[in-house]
């Protein structure tokens, strides 16, 4: 939609600190230039099974901000307050691009590393958001890649719910 915003000014409601990730001679900080936070209002039935704080589970209006950053962490925050909804998930790779949530409502996140790290070659992570466990990884050794060993995932995944297809260009 459209709105007349000529008299309105944006003000920061809160901010969240991130760390840094060193890999070789490089240090990554902040969030990537294509990185956008994901936001989700989880159904109460789903939140009951998630590893969220009790306050987050009890908040019927909670919109969770999920933000993969260049320090190797995925952060989980309350959109209204900026408070943590759960502990950060450390994956050890820099994330420059936005992740994606499964459009069918499954608590699954797809996020790809934007650069290699001391942990190994960049790859895509499929994350179970009930307990923040890694369900699957792929893309780190793509024999069909035209870019050789450059398996960086700076974009965002697309999930076609109708055909149960994941598209994640690297």
Protein language model regions, located:
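Noncatalytic, solvent-exposed loop/strand surfaces
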Residues: 1-170
